[in-house]
Amino acid sequence: MTSETPDSASSAPVHFATLASLQARVGQHLATSPWVLIDQQRIDLFAQATGDHQWIHVDPVRAAAGPFGTPIAHGFLTLSLLPELAASAMHIDDVKMGVNYGLNRVRFMAPVPVGSRLRGQLRLKAYEPIEGGAQLTMEVSIEREGAVKPVCVAEAVSRRFI
């Protein structure tokens, strides 16, 4: 667990009344998501959807004898959790829709063994007004329960519209 991580997170998302209210929160921690279980079924479904069937992910017998001692989640599966983690952590009441705009500075810091529980820490890095809404840059740190360092860090850039 990282030093700025609360020991527990509420399962209810943090509510912000307006998108504009986030402008004053730049540089601050906004929310922590609930834990998400990464089981073999999720890994297998991701492999099926992406065509990445590397044995370290989908062959438990072979993976047990491999470098991690168990199957591990795809790095991109971990990254693909960003929308789920963000949506379960926070809600902006006046936002009608949002779209992904891009990613910056993505790093996979540690493997995610099957059976791990992950959660996201969300910190608002930037708020830029755009027509009809705002562009948000969120620093997301994905943590594995019981681990010292994050498994993935990324800056997620999204556009939210009111």
Q: Which residue ranges define each predicted feature?
A:
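HotDog/MaoC-like acyl-thioester-processing domains
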Residues: 2-24, 111-162
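Generic structural detector for well-ordered beta-strands
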Residues: 31, 35-37, 107, 113, ...
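A solvent-exposed, acidic/Ser-Thr-rich amphipathic alpha-helical stretch
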Residues: 74-78
